[in-house]
Amino acid sequence: MPGGACVLVIALMFLAWGEAQECSPGGHQFLRSPYRSVRFDSWHLQQSAVQDLICDHSLSPGWYRFLILDRPAEMPTKCVEMNHCGTQAPIWLSLRDSETLPSPGEIKQLTACATWQFLFSTTKDCCLFQIPVSVRNCGNFSVYLLQPTQGCMGYCAEAISDARLHPCGSDETETGGDCVRQLAASLPPPPAGRPEVLVELIESRLFCRCSFDVPATKNSVGFHIAWSRLSSQEVKEELTQETTVQAFSLLELDGINLRLGDRIFCSASVFFLENPHVQSVAIESQEFFAGFKLQPELSTISEDGKEYYLRIESTVPIICSEFSELDQECKISLKLKTIGQGREHLGLNLALSSCHVDLLQTSSCANGTCSHTFVYYTAVTDFSRDGDRVSNIVVQPIVNEDFLWNNYIPDSIQIKVKDVPTAYCYTFTDPHIITFDGRVYDNFKTGTFVLYKSMSRDFEVHVRQWDCRSLHYPVSCNCGFVAQEGGDIVTFDMCNGQLRESQPYLFIKSQDVTRNIKISESYLGRKVTIWFSSGAFIRADLGEWGMSLTIRAPSVDYRNTLGLCGTFDENPENDFHDKNGMQIDQNFNNYVAFINEWRILPGKSMSDTLPVSMTSPGKPSYCSCSLDTAAYPSSEDLDSVSRSEIALGCKDLNHVSLSSLIPELDVTSEYINSDTLVREINKHTSPEEYNLNLFLQEKKHINLTKLGLNVQKHPGNEKEDSLQYLANKKYTQGRGSHSQEMRYNRQNRWKRQNFHEFPPLFAFPSLSQTDLEELTYFFPEDHAEDVQQEFFPSWPTPSGLTEYSTLTLCQETLANSSIGRLCLAFLGKRLDSVIEMCVKDVLLKDDLSWAEAGVALLENECEKRIVEEGKYNTEEYGTSIEDILSVLKCPNLCSGNGQCMEWGCACSPSFSSYDCSDSYDKAPEITELGNAGFCDVQKYNCMMVRVFGKGFKELPSIKCEVTKLQYNSSEWMPGEPIYTQTVFHNSRAVDCQLPTDVQQFDTMDLVGGKPTGKWQLKVSNDGYKFSNPKITVIYDGACQVCGLYKNDSCTIKENVCIIDGLCYVEGDKNPTSPCLICRPKISRFTWSFLENNQPPVIQALQDKLQTFYGENFEYQFVAFDPEGSDIHFTLDSGPEGASVSSAGLFMWKTDLLTTQQITVRLNDDCDAETRVTIEVTVKSCDCLNGGSCVSDRNFSPGSGVYLCVCLPGFHGSLCEVDISGCQSNPCGLGSYISGFHSYSCDCPPELKVETQFVNQFTTQTVVLTRSDKSVNKEEDDKNAQGRKRHVKPTSGNAFTICKYPCGKSRECVAPNICKCKPGYIGSNCQTALCDPDCKNHGKCIKPNICQCLPGHGGATCDEEHCNPPCQHGGTCLAGNLCTCPYGFVGPRCETMVCNRHCENGGQCLTPDICQCKPGWYGPTCSTALCDPVCLNGGSCNKPNTCLCPNGFFGEHCQNAFCHPPCKNGGHCMRNNVCVCREGYTGRRFQKSICDPTCMNGGKCVGPSTCSCPSGWSGKRCNTPICLQKCKNGGECIAPSICHCPSSWEGVRCQIPICNPKCLYGGRCIFPNVCSCRTEYSGVKCEKKIQIRRH
């Protein structure tokens, strides 16, 4: 070949080499920083702009090309001085021995070196660190395969000279530095167009086709085509060559020479047929991938719940064997798997919507795609701080009968999952709230609040807080919550009841079928957790006082939360925010404004109304699709994702962790898949039964009998299936008392706030689903006035508890608990904050039992920390993880009384409870009685006494021992004990029934004139070992005041009487003798006679009473008694036949025409008498023509007005008009017969009418005959009783016609003969006929229509009507009289008689109800009302006037009196009890105190001011001082003593530690980083090398 042609070919080959993948424009990245130049001195960067230093430790591995200000550059091959190339340690390319740079198109593996010079050293080390670098010569430039550096180092670049930037042209060759153009005769043909590789189907076989465009030329050309593929080592392997005159080539995809998954290339060169050795440069095609591609939407995702699609496509057609079954669809099935990189125990962090996809056969390929499908993937929300992780999605080997497809494994892809924080919020006990970001504050307010609201999705939690029994300070506790996620709404509530009595109930108000919700119980129901599909959960730790809540926020809510739990953005400073998310101004009480901001108005919370939520669209379920389920730990070993494999599609599994390290019992089905969606927790179900539930789950795996363990059954319990038992015991408390709470809300709610009242007991039925949907109740705390109460608690407490003793108890209870000791490394400072909460709880409530409430927080926090980080740091924590898991499963390690199983404690015989701490052999302990043991028989049913304590067990043998105490002389003596019925509520509360005569007053003993009944109570679980005794006092609140404020005794009230052992309030009358009354000022022990009794008073009578002869005269006397006594009427004198009823109704049948005098006597119950005489005038009855007189009801009785009732044929006011006159010849052809005021007609025989009565609503047929023709006429008669008449003329020629009209009441029946129409009679048919007859002198005006006289009504006038009508439910009687209901009198029952004497200006509304004036209440308005109520035991004497006990004064007895007065600003809290100002203590508060106390020998020199010894500082002298600052993360733990990390040592932690040690004189310059001497390298400098320097 001539030299010129050779040069041309080489030049064209350079072009081909430049087409390597890394040489292509998208195959590499650029490093353009001018600082990388070897000539750039980086000293000034270190002095002024450290952030601009070149540090390639975070450089992504890949191919790079260097540019300096857009000028081509390459790595230098000579040693570069330190502090050049924009960095401290520049990296250059070292060519050792005979190494050279790669020639064009070649790639070489070379070594790069970093230059470094140690401090105080005079020589530099050009190759202190070595990094492998691959170099590819792309012709005009070079690219480098670079790796990230170990530290802050930088790769150098050197600009290419101008001479090298302008090589000779493609048709030129370099000769002596000059470019000489070649001769035209030796030029090769122009190259072909870039080939393209495609797959096509030819006769059921797959072929790769390489085709290209042919350049235009004058000569005949041929083509040389070469096939190659890229090996797994990224090296091209030639497959075959072909010389052809066709512009394409075919190569079969046979699975042997060419397989699926190959990356295929073809190249084509052109040659002249006349001169075959002259060829063009070979042009290579783009890479063609034959097989399946997995193309993710994003390769880097976050744990934020978002979903992404994965496109799976095939670049080759899907074909099926001709021998395959005809009914099978032609497809290729792929099974997907996910493999997480890194340590196996991290668990999976990627989930797929399906582990199985199908690629179906298509008719053709388009845009390089022959078939495709989709599957969704998402990050697993694992609630772990596992950092950013990478997972592979791989495809299992394809199983197919076609050799081409069988065992083909498509390339996997990598998905990087970025970790997103999750957080927990705690609201415990008082409650103390710890926000998502860790800020701690107290919310002592009551009401309903927004606890947690997501701005990124439909999720919200409302919490209710009630007053929880602090005797001295206004504190609150959680009593329930409602949580909503989308369409799922769950309520867990115990607010509708009284403190320590109410039981929590849980129900699902709404459910979204597209989501999964889970409800679980742990520790025998002490923990209840609601899990939502997003991963959020709400856990309630139950107590008799309410519940503590733990809320978990998933990563999807990061930076998207509002409410009392804060903003969840890892910045606690902005947790106090308003409803718009804006931070509330910083001030001393900004938390108060923050709490008020999130308080919900009454009736607006989800507890009161069902929120409107849009049903979320259906989302795909996800599977783990893990590679090997056995390779991952089970749920007990902290795996957060289920390992079940779904064959076709994912159904129920989630991409969110819903597992717990604390053993749990899934009880979801009890609330979702049952007719009743509510079950009361811990009510009527003992812990033993819950334990039985757990055992039932494990019975098929564990033989508990062989272990000698107690399955905790009792006689009677094993008869029922435990779960069925729970299902049958579904009650709720509060429904039955709803109406009472609405009526007596003020008094009822004070029962919750005042511990000293005895709460009522009610029985409540089960609730239906309809009840649950409408279940709302009145929550008084929502309506209470929001008043910020400042209080200053101080030590010691009123009961004498000191701060030191309380702190010791809290530390022992919490820090020394099993969870506190074993999980200390994880709890850290959280343990200290929980101990502080414990101390504050005891201080505020003065009750040591609250010390245990914080253990639940430690359990939840420990579980959280282990889930977040513990299981990923097994090297650091060692075997302590296993110990912690054991104590989470088995609290207190089963107290040494049982064996720890996977599901919890299996207690030994005679022990029970979730931690086996309760012993059956141990007698229970009574701590107190309901309402401190006092019960007022006037207010409550004292038959049942609520007993609070510890160790109660629901056993058939549980019983109460009740002993009546008899007062003998000066002491109480016990009587015979009685064993009574016991109602078990839970392990801390039972009800004891007292004997049936407990409320009979004759059972009370007079103690100095004070009637009191005392009973001693004991409780036993087994009937043998009884608890300590407690005394309950039954008293009559009408006469006595009992309670704590009366020094545990009772005192008799003023203004009461004690008569015959019974108690009466002043003004009470003798039940059998109304004239005897209680007058304590006259006699407290006998009845007093009702003095100054006034006689009854008759109300004003009518001026004149009249009646008429023959009237049944009735008149009602009305009177009242000033004292409210009953009145009795008697007739003293009057006419014969007259009488008066005891109620005052006078009756007389008037049979005389003379005026009569009547005398009536009125007597009250005390025989006071009043006489009244009335005169009645009798008028005559002036009705004529036999008419009779009746009373006119339009006038009141006694007016004497009457009406006349006339006989037929007469009318007029006095019946004076005769209406019986006849018309001329009224009978026509018949003969006229006259009668008394009437007439009749005697018809000829031929016109006589046969009358037959028929039933009502029949058809009346009249047959008329004329000219031998019969005509039938039918008519309906529905208004009267029909008659069927047959008029039978004797002659067929007769024609009937009436000359004169018959009138409206008659009809023509024969020639000139009219007869009465049906329903009418009389000579002129003027009298209508009514059947039945009209009563009470009613008049028949139309057939069967009566016109009634005044005072009567109805169809036949048989109903009495009174005018005016009777009032107040009175019944009308004959004679326009009213009979009145109880409590009303008068002619129209218009006067009410009040049976109660309404006092203090009250008015009688109904006979038994008084309407009181403001400030008074009670049945007779005798009790004054003080608002606000009298405090500190004060009694309400008059409206808003309190009578204070000794030691208190003020309008509401709110001020205490201390003598001597409190010093130094101390506050008088109650009688002679001072509360010290902060910083002082002592009897006179003369001592200053430091709280917390000074540490490390510091002295308290002022309130909370410490004087620290040398070497210590800080407010508490708790901060050590190191004069020489600790370096490299060391911590100053004592004066001038540093605690160093494991990789540093020395006084100031300034000396690094290399393990293993550096060899051959190497020096340790960083932890585990050696600086080797010249000619040595390696991690430990263990390798000896030769360095060639240039």
From Swiss-Prot:
Residues 1-20 form the signal peptide. InterPro entries: Dev_Signal_Modulators, EGF-like_dom, VWF_type-D. It comes from the Eukaryota. PROSITE patterns: EGF_1, EGF_2, EGF_3, VWFD. Residues 1177-1216, 1294-1326, 1358-1390, 1422-1454, 1455-1486, 1518-1550, 1551-1582 form the EGF-like domain. Residues 1268-1280 have a biased composition (Basic and acidic residues). Glycans are attached at residues 367, 703, 968. Its main location: secreted. GO terms for molecular function: signaling receptor binding. SUPFAM superfamilies: EGF/Laminin (SSF57196). Residues 423-606 form the VWFD domain. The keyword Secreted applies. Pfam families: D8C_UMOD, VWD. It is found in: Secreted. Residues 1268-1288 are annotated as: Disordered. Disulfide bonds join 425-565, 468-477, 1181-1189, 1183-1204, 1206-1215, 1298-1308, 1302-1314, 1316-1325, 1362-1372, 1366-1378, 1380-1389, 1426-1436, 1430-1442, 1444-1453, 1458-1468, 1462-1474, 1522-1532, 1526-1538, 1540-1549, 1554-1564, 1558-1570, 1572-1581. The keyword Transcription regulation does not apply. Keywords: Disulfide bond, EGF-like domain, Glycoprotein, Repeat, Secreted, Signal. One of its GO terms (cellular component) is extracellular region. This is von Willebrand factor D and EGF domain-containing protein.
